[in-house]
């Protein structure tokens, strides 16, 4: 007598207890979770039960008055307006991380960390700068013991000065290293894997480790890109689960995506983001694994609103096109833009 082992195997997998299936699904990346969900009804139920929807960042921008600021939530296309504390009127946004902003006066000497949802302000020690700093960022919210604020500047050829500050310190810590790295046009700084990654105009990467206080320029050739300076205008670096990605584009050109492969010492070009959604801006970028239905996955959201600030400009890799194609991204305008994506707290709707 013959036995249909294939049919038996199918039934065995289909009839696994929901608790066991759900336990297995928790170990899957989101793209594999989605694939598993189409196998059968029981797998769909298990996959969906453990699937975590990432809350999208909000776009924060300043009207011309500068006395207020607006939030735009791309998940529901709603806008919220809040009043800027009088003490921060005239301050400029430099960087964003974990729902906080690093801001400074025009001369860059007076830095503060500001939470635009709770209105909390943390003043940093005065920083003596004879000229404008070139890169700046911070590792985490100032409520964390791991918070490190980082600035870098080259005062003379062949040397860079790195300054750091952490909560509880009354002054900045300074160090100088030999390096020809600094030739930057945008603030491309990402904190990931416990270190700061910095990208310069020539698309070389340097790494600063705040715990070891070491600075190293990686021996990685720049990503291959059309030999056109315009491609430097739309250049963004973002971190995702330990990976470093660079997005490059200009005007209405399709974005190019590169992933840093430290093992092989190369930038690997990617033609898809999978289920990832990236939100880019001049000051800092955000990434989300699985945004809610109604938003575009495998896409890049730009810091530009149109149609009376009702919709954001998005490029979809699935469709190979920009949404709102007729709206040109003015990269020259974006260079000086204060528009920035920021992570809202869980209770954001109670605060705005």
UniProtKB/Swiss-Prot annotation:
Domain of life: Eukaryota
Kelch repeat residues: 148-189, 190-234
Entry-linked Gene3D superfamilies: 1.20.1280.50
Residues covered by the F-box domain: 10-56
Alphabetical list of InterPro entries matching this protein: F-box-like_dom_sf (IPR036047), F-box_dom (IPR001810), Gal_Oxase/kelch_b-propeller (IPR011043), KIB1-4_b-propeller (IPR005174)
Record flagged with keyword Oxidoreductase: no
UniProt keyword annotations, A-Z: Kelch repeat, Repeat
Protein name: F-box/kelch-repeat protein At1g57790
Source taxonomy: Eukaryota, Viridiplantae, Streptophyta, Embryophyta, Tracheophyta
């Amino acid at each position: 007598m013959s036995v249909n082992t294939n049919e038996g195997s199918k039934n065995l997998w289909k009839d696994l207890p929901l608790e066991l299936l759900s336990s297995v699904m928790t170990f899957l990346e989101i793209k594999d979770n989605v694939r598993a969900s189409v196998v059968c009804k029981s797998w769909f139920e298990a996959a969906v039960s453990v699937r975590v929807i990432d809350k999208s960042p909000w776009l924060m921008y300043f009207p011309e008055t500068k006395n207020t600021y607006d939030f735009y939530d791309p998940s529901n296309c709603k806008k919220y307006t809040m009043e800027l504390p009088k003490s921060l009127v005239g301050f400029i946004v430099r960087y964003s991380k974990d729902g906080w902003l690093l801001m400074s006066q025009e001369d860059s000497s007076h830095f503060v960390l500001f939470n635009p949802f709770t209105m909390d302000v943390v003043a940093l020690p005065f920083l003596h700068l004879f000229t404008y700093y070139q890169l700046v960022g911070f590792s985490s919210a100032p409520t964390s013991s791991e918070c490190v604020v980082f600035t870098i500047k080259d005062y003379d050829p062949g040397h860079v000065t790195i300054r750091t500050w952490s909560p509880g310190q009354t002054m900045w810590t300074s160090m100088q290293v030999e390096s020809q790295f600094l030739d930057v046009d945008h603030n491309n700084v990402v904190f990931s894997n416990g270190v700061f990654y910095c990208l310069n105009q020539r698309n070389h990467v340097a790494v600063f480790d705040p715990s070891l206080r070491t600075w190293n320029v990686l021996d990685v050739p720049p990503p291959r890109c059309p030999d056109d300076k315009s491609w430097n205008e739309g250049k963004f670096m973002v971190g995702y689960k330990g990976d470093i990605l660079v997005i490059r584009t200009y005007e209405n050109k399709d974005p190019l995506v590169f992933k840093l492969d430290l093992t092989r010492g190369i930038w690997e070009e990617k033609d898809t983001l999978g289920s990832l959604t990236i939100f880019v801006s001049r000051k800092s970028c955000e990434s989300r694994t699985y945004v809610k239905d109604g938003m575009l996955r495998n896409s890049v959201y730009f810091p530009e609103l149109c149609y009376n600030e009702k919709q954001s400009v998005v490029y979809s890799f699935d469709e190979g096109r920009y949404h709102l194609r007729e709206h040109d991204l003015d990269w020259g305008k974006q260079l000086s833009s204060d528009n920035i994506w920021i992570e809202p707290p869980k209770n954001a709707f109670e605060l705005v």
